[in-house]
């Protein structure tokens, strides 16, 4: 069962300019430590760093839309973090107000699953989020059979 869908498209140069202007203040306010570490591993090319941050920014916007709140109602930037599963597939980890909102949307006996697609083609980055509720037993079976 689909709980929410969100998408976002952003100009990578906009994120690059914000990073240039506000630096650490912006990065600390918006991105998790894991997201920052991922971007910094790409530091040899400033375009790659900006694109990495832009994709994650778009993912947070898309996720907040899928939650039905936007960045308000207790859902903040750092409550949503992009992580990669062992096979490399991106997903999101929610904490704080975002996790509280997700839990409120998830029906009893179900587990929330967040599917994320992120991409970039200079100068644009895009993210698409689908939040689904799946039976808790099915989620357990997936984790035990992997």
Swiss-Prot record:
GO CC entries: cytoplasm
GO biological process: fatty acid biosynthetic process
Alphabetic keyword roster: Cytoplasm, Fatty acid biosynthesis, Fatty acid metabolism, Lipid biosynthesis, Lipid metabolism, Magnesium, Metal-binding, Transferase
TM region(s), chain numbering: none
Catalytic activity annotation: apo-[ACP] + CoA = holo-[ACP] + adenosine 3',5'-bisphosphate + H(+)
Domain of life per record: Bacteria
Enzyme class: transferase
Cofactor: Mg(2+)
Presence of the UniProt keyword Lyase in the record: no
GO molecular function, one term: magnesium ion binding
Binding, Mg(2+): 8, 61
Signal peptide start-end: none
Enzyme Commission number(s) of this protein: 2.7.8.7
Subcellular location: Cytoplasm
Gene3D superfamilies given in the database record: 4'-phosphopantetheinyl transferase domain (3.90.470.20)
Family: Belongs to the P-Pant transferase superfamily. AcpS family.
Function, as annotated: Transfers the 4'-phosphopantetheine moiety from coenzyme A to a Ser of acyl-carrier-protein.
UniProt protein name: Holo-[acyl-carrier-protein] synthase
Organism: Rhodopseudomonas palustris (strain ATCC BAA-98 / CGA009)
């Amino acid at each position: 069962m689909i709980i929410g869908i969100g998408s976002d498209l952003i100009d990578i140069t906009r994120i690059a300019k914000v990073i240039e202007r506000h630096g650490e203040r912006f990065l600390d306010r918006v991105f998790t430590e894991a997201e920052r570490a991922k971007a910094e591993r790409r530091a040899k090319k400033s375009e790659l760093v900006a694109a990495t941050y832009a994709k994650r920014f778009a993912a947070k916007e898309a996720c907040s839309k899928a939650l039905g709140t936007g960045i308000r109602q207790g859902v903040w930037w750092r409550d949503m973090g992009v992580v990669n599963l062992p096979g490399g597939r991106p997903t999101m980890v929610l904490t704080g107000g975002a996790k509280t909102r997700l839990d409120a949307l998830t029906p009893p006996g179900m587990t929330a699953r967040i599917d994320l697609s992120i991409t970039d083609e200079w100068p644009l980055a895009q993210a698409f989020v689908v939040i689904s509720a799946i039976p808790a037993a099915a989620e357990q079976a997936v984790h035990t059979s992997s």
